Design a protein with these regions (language model features):
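Active-site donor/metal-binding and catalytic loop motifs
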Residues: 86-102
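Single conserved hydrophobic/aromatic residue that forms the stacking wall/gate
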Residues: 1-12
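Extended repeat-based solenoid scaffolds, especially LRR ectodomains
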Residues: 10-32
């Protein structure tokens, strides 16, 4: 199959939502191959899919220490202002959905909060509360109470600020988060 499951070059919206251009295009269809070549405005591309000028990669402009989910989003939004996508070039990897881990709930929401605070001027306390409420209730309704706790902890840790993030032993935190969540089966 030549179906593009995800478009390349995303538009970043409030609340950490990435809107992917040209997702699910069946590239065996001529009209979709032509449409795939149309230029679109995009603000982000995953760094594992980009050639970033070496002048950008400097000691004073490194990625934030928020590895696992969202680190490439923040770095891409900050540095990759002019993106060029080329038809036929792709990266094949396991879909994120099949890499389930409870710990991701912590990292995804915490890191979305960090990204939004830096790149979405309209992201305020009300938006944060709405995000948290929606995601926590979704997990509670599925009886995934540990995931709900991890979401709340992610927001609490975000609210501790940059000093806390810089001083935290990321490896120890990760071990703690991994030990708390549900184990994949």
């Amino acid at each position: 199959d030549l179906v593009r499951s995800r478009g390349l070059g995303d538009v970043y919206k409030r609340q950490g939502q990435l809107i992917s251009h040209k997702a699910n295009f069946d590239l065996t269809k001529v009209d979709l191959c032509v449409a795939n070549e149309l230029e679109e405005r995009h603000e982000y591309n995953a760094w594992w899919y980009c050639c970033i000028p070496i002048a950008v990669v400097r000691p004073d402009n490194l990625p934030m220490p928020i590895f696992i989910r969202g680190d490439d989003i923040e770095y891409g939004l900050r540095n990759c202002k002019r993106l060029v996508t080329l038809n036929g070039i792709c990266v094949w990897h396991e879909p994120f959905e099949s890499k389930y881990s409870s710990s991701m709930y912590y990292y995804i929401l915490r890191n979305q909060c960090i990204d939004n605070s830096m790149h979405c001027p309209g992201y305020d306390a009300n938006a944060l509360k709405a995000d948290l409420r929606s995601q926590v209730m979704g997990e509670v309704n599925r009886y995934r109470y540990k995931n709900a706790d991890l979401l709340i902890r992610g927001v609490r840790d975000f609210l501790k600020g940059i000093d806390w993030l810089e001083q935290t032993d990321a490896e120890a935190l990760h071990k703690e988060i991994m030990a708390y969540g549900y184990k994949a089966q």
